[in-house]
């Protein structure tokens, strides 16, 4: 979550060969004219310069496989959120690979795909969301030679809330 955690991790238990860092692009995250959330106010995640520095340091410490994680908005009821987030992280992954020579093994799109809490709201179409992520993957990662990157998700609210659990 924070570049200062690298030294703490190293001192506490050593640096593993596989690690994931959280990215915070800062500013406001919006789709169209709707502001979805304000990652700039979040206390978690590294800025772009910080994540580049962190990956450089971690590579020197022996990390072989990197992951990227980001959480930009909560409970979005929009089929565009996940594909937009995926595009941001896929482009960052390509930049990190090309500039630092690191291997990005996985990207965690986290959560944020929500549910409508009132009957007048349209629910997310998970198939449209998946198709948008697939399209971004094929347009950004595959041409960069990164077609082996795994995608992780955390869709707890989307999967469980309609059944009375959260």
PLM features per residue range, with description:
Residues 74-166:
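C-terminal active-site-proximal or functional interface alpha/beta core segments in diverse enzymes
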Residues 1-106, 115, 136:
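Active-site-proximal beta-alpha core segment in soluble small-molecule metabolic enzymes
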């Amino acid at each position: 979550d924070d570049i200062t955690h690298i030294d703490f991790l190293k001192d506490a238990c050593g640096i593993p060969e596989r690690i994931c860092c959280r990215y915070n692009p800062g500013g406001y995250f919006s789709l169209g004219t709707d502001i979805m959330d304000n990652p700039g106010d979040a206390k978690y995640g590294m800025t772009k310069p910080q994540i580049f520095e962190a990956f450089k340091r971690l590579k020197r410490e022996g990390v072989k496989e990197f992951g990227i994680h980001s959480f930009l908005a909560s409970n979005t009821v929009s089929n565009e959120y996940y594909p937009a987030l995926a595009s941001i992280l896929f482009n960052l992954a390509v930049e990190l690979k090309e500039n630092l020579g690191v291997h990005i093994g996985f990207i965690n799109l986290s959560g944020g795909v929500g549910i409508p809490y009132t009957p007048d709201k349209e629910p997310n179409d998970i198939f449209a969301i998946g198709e948008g992520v697939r399209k971004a993957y094929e347009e950004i990662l595959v041409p960069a030679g990164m077609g082996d990157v795994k995608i992780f998700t955390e869709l707890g609210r989307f999967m469980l809330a309609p059944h009375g659990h959260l």
